[in-house]
Curated annotation (Swiss-Prot):
It comes from Rhizobium radiobacter. Residues 13-23, 178-190 have a biased composition (Basic and acidic residues). This is Replicating protein. The keyword Signal does not apply. Residues 1-23, 168-250 are annotated as: Disordered.
Amino acid sequence: MFQQIGAVQAKSGTDEPAHPCEKFPPERKCEAVFWKPLPRHEAREILLAARKYELAMKQPGKRTGPLGHVALEVLDYLTNLVDFGNGRLDPSISTIMEKIGRAESCMSALYPNRQRGRRPAGAADKQRLPLEPAGARPRALLGKYVRKAAPLPDDAAQARQERHDTIKAHMDSLSPADRLRETVEDRTRAEQLAGYVERAAQNRPSGPRKAARRRQQSRCSFTTPNRPRRTLPSSHPQKFGGTKGRKAFE
């Protein structure tokens, strides 16, 4: 036992530097991945969409809508505070309370904004200004105030259609197994599925084997062939009451 302990102590005395075990790459720890540039006109559209959404969703007899006037004040302050170049926006609660002149109502006003806006997970102390407070409804309420994207040029649309047709023709020319290898992103899973399809195609009867199986199935069927109609021989008319009985039978 003491020899094993000594061997372990001798190995632990190396001069190699210790390397930390990083579970995630450094890009995931950087906040630059979270922030995105926000143009100034989009910030104005966000605030205008929130105001129109507040008026459109306000119930009769209520003082405020689903957001509230304090939430609009907070959103107005955030749109003026955001860095349009990189989209960074991380004010503290005390700063927001001081700037808009609100106390506890500031905390309650942030909740409707979070509930009606997309908020990334793992960002408890950061704010984002997406133009999706309640799906596509605020964007529809903006109407003409939202900048619409320019239509695609004719050559770009034609190039996209040609590329789509080329890809479709290529996929149609492939076998089912090769099509799985092209479409499934996981290579291991793609090979497994392609192997299943190829083995199923090999075990499927075709050609002479298929014809033999069909003949065997036809022999095992219980359908009787159509037999010709039986006629009474004319040499024994007395068995059926003479000629009259034979005519009645026929």
